[in-house]
Amino acid sequence: MVSAQARCAAGLQIRVTVSILGHWLIGYFAHNQGRRDWDVPGAAVQGHNVRWCALLTMGESWHNNHHAFPGSARIGLEPGQWDPGWWVLQLLHRAGVVSDLKLPDSLPARADLKRLNRYCSDA
C-alpha cells in the first residue's frame, strides 16, 4: 500500500513536470511556428498562435496575441480560441479575489501593431 505522503509527493512531481513541459512547449513552438495574426515591428521575436495546445497550456499557446497585447489578462481573443486561464480569472473576479483585469481595448493603443490576418475558425 502506498502512503498518503508518497502519493502527495508523486502528484507534486507530476504537476511540476507537466507545468515545465508546457512552458518549454510554448517557448519552442509558439516562438517558431504557428499562425500569426499580428506583427509587432521591432520585436526581437514574434509569437505564434498554436491552436492544438491551448487547453494544455491554459491558453498560453495564443502567444501571438500575447505578444500583440502583453498587458491583457485574456489571450484567446478570437471566437474559438479557448483560454482556460481567462476562464479561471473570470471566476476569481466574480469571487472578488482578483480585480482590474485588463483587456486589449483597455490598454494604450500601439501605433506599431499591425494586423496580418482576420481570424478564421477553420485555420
Summary of predicted features, one role per range:
Residues P70, E78, K114-L116:
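Surface-exposed beta-strand edges and their flanking turn/coil or helix-capping segments
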Residues M1-M58, W87, L91-R94, V98-A123:
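Hydrophobic transmembrane alpha-helical segments that form the core helix bundle
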Residues S72-L92:
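Basic, amphipathic juxtamembrane/active-site segments
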